Amino acid sequence: MSSQSLYKVSGNIAANALVNNDKYKTMYQESIVNPEGFWREHGKRIDWIKPYTKIKKTSFDDHNLSINWFYDGTLNASANCLDRHLAEHSDRVAIIWEGDNASEQRKITYGELHAEVCKFANALRSQGVRRGDIVTIYMPMVPEAAVAMLACARIGAVHSVVFGGFSPDSIASRVIDGKSKVIITSDEGMRGGRAIPLKRNIDDALKNPDVTTVEKVIVLKRTGGIVDWVEDRDVWWHSLMETASEYCQPEEMDAEAPLFLLYTSGSTGNPKGVLHTTGGYMVYASMTHEYVFDYKAGEVYWCTADVGWITGHSYMVYGPLANGATVLIHEGVPNHPSPARLGEMIDRHKVSILYTAPTLIRALMAEGKQHFDKFDGSSLRIMGSVGEPINPEAWRWYHEVIGHEHCPIVDTWWQTETGGILITPLPGATDTKPGSATRPFFGVQPALVDNMGNILEGENEGNLVLLDSWPGQMRTVYGDHERFVLTYFKTFRGMYFTGDGARRDEDGYYWITGRVDDVINVSGHRLGTAEVESALVSHELVAEAAVVGYPHDIKGQGIYAYVTLTRGTEETEELRQELRQWVRKEIGALATPDLIQWATGLPKTRSGKIMRRFLRKIAANEVTNLGDASTLADPAVIETLIESRLNRTE
């Protein structure tokens, strides 16, 4: 890596940061050599009802898997985000909210948020929610989404937040798997000037005959839009809040008690319920938020992620609020009604720290930097990137146009499963290289292995694994521990397999190269190819489908589908559009195929396995060096697919 591509930490930033390079090296070394001692100390950053004495009981042996942190302590996550700030910071603003329409704005102090959470926790109890129950949350980006999450945590209920862009079928599958008794939703949400029919989607999901556990649907009135109503099942949020008491004693929870479920795409097609527990997760979310973003008290912090994703959980709700931060929540998209919106909001709310995704940066880049001519940006101090590897061009644009060349960029790598950031620069410690996630956070031991599981030393490329546990790690796949072991610990014995490939350069910096399994990263969100294939094949005119990712200028990866139609079906543009809408309805807008190529046949081995590496290369327009096709049952299929490919650049 040439020195011109190295962005040095400025002396001023290093002098004022929580951690400089020397301190990073000392702390990191201690966290690896003496993890018990390191986490014994740093676990104290949150409040415990019963202090822990036991720190770490972990093993990645697939026959004796164990992940336990602070496991004899007790605490409450909601109390850590609210109650502990009341004595000194009750009047500090916890949430600044800006609606899809900028004229709608609210500020909520820690004292006010505490009262709202207590009231809603009591409201949940009035609807029969008890400790250990799973509550599904399908909400727009409004403060009440955070209130609902924290209220669940307060009474020991387990929340399962479903992204507001998911379809009724996707909601139903998650409700069925989690056996939810109560769903919290809104009449509608607002996004990009459009009303999103959240309540209608819930109604449709609950028509699924396999949904049998739901007793109550609590509905927030957001837009006042007309909704259908089911008596004895549906209840208005505001009606419950009118009579609810303003104090609710937080439940004392074991450190290893479940805090939330969050469903993520897997390569098998069935979304898997990632289970996070309370103690280790809260320690890790709060610590990474403070150190990675170099957070200082009183700063306004804006994470643009939706609450339905892990980034929204860890870095919009639990991490920042545990640290007493002022969090900006935006209901809409930061490039509506114009690309200038992002800059306007940073200036309007004096944002110090911005955490966003490469897909938004690329979208703004495509619109042109003239939209930032009036952008001041002087409040901005730190910028982050999350969701997928950021390409160097987008990194530089972000640095120059949004950061005015003075804000460090923390390009963070982590996963739903990891609970928090694992590989990242620290603003005062790490010289950065555009496109590299750089170095591991404290306590994180990444390694590269070949396909046989042999550790690769030095400058190299391979499968990214982790050699030991960290407090924020998921504990299991809900209801399917065997799948958890199989997915993450069987591929490479004694190691956690991330599913990502990476290379390590001459400076020891990590560069994430993308998924090595059948998962596509669309706009920073993971989609299993099997999930999209299943949706396509469920259409009566589709005989077979194979889905791969391909390079997309805005989204990072687009969805490229190869579809074989039933015999005698005509290949028309109308049918292509019908299939796109079909997938959209089955899964959600995020899963809509960008390109659908008609295929008379797919490249298969004699045993019937589809050889996806050929399909990926054709979709990426890399057709000159496809490699050995001799194992295919019908090698001629490849030529036909190349001839009719849709992603040509010539």
Curated annotation (Swiss-Prot):
N6-acetyllysine: modified positions: 609
List where the protein spans the membrane: none
Q: Which positions does UniProt annotate for CoA binding?
A: 191-194, 311, 335, 523, 584
Which residues does the record give as Mg(2+) binding sites? 537, 539, 542
| Keywords, ordered alphabetically | Acetylation, ATP-binding, Ligase, Magnesium, Metal-binding, Nucleotide-binding
Q: Which GO terms describe its cellular component?
A: cytosol
HAMAP family in alphabetical order: Ac_CoA_synth
* PANTHER family found in the cross-reference section: ACETYL-COENZYME A SYNTHETASE
Name assigned to this protein: Acetyl-coenzyme A synthetase
Q: Which organism is it from?
A: Shewanella baltica (strain OS195)
Question: By which gene is this protein encoded?
Answer: acsA
